[in-house]
Amino acid sequence: MAELVDHLAELTGFRDRELLDVTLVGALRDLLRPRAVAIYRSVGEAGQERWLTRARLSHDDLAASADPAWIDLDGLPRHEEHPHRLQAFHDQAIVLVAGDPHRAFFPVATDREQLGVMEVESEAPLDERDQRLVMSILRIYRNFQGLLDYSERDTLTGLLNRKTFDESFLKMVAQPAPA
């Protein structure tokens, strides 16, 4: 129980959404001990949606991997290439797929939008207790994303506040341009 509380405290300790995603997959990896856990975001125009890897950790990874912010969207996998992920995203429901590995797909959303899918690969199927654990942590993630949205945006215009805009701008210009 203490480990869970520690992970929740760490999860809600960041204002950076990229770190939040990395912390989320790290917490689930530590708590579930799966082969891998990843969060994928749906990006692109309607009819051309793709899956962007926000954070992925295998059981033996030291650091999470992710797609770079400036990736060419055409190089990302199309929604249709991952039908179980797409089903969880559209139905906003857990999708369980037996096999080697077993896979569980969990919808990830905020109060404003459907973001993507959390995918857990494991040796054995996730039991009900583990599924509830993931859904509960994703609810906390959703609530925290809502708090971030509220604190970062002007309620009248929906525009980023000055501090958030400055941080986002500086982060963007600090990244190397795509080759």
Language-model regions, residue ranges each:
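Helix-loop-beta substructure at the N-terminus of cytosolic sensory domains
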Residues: 10-63
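Acidic/proline- and glycine-rich, intrinsically disordered low-complexity segments
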Residues: 52-93
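Regulatory loop-to-helix N-cap segments in sensory/regulatory domains
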Residues: 96-99, 119-135
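Conserved nucleotide-binding and Mg2+-coordinating catalytic segments in signaling enzymes
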Residues: 149-170, 176-179
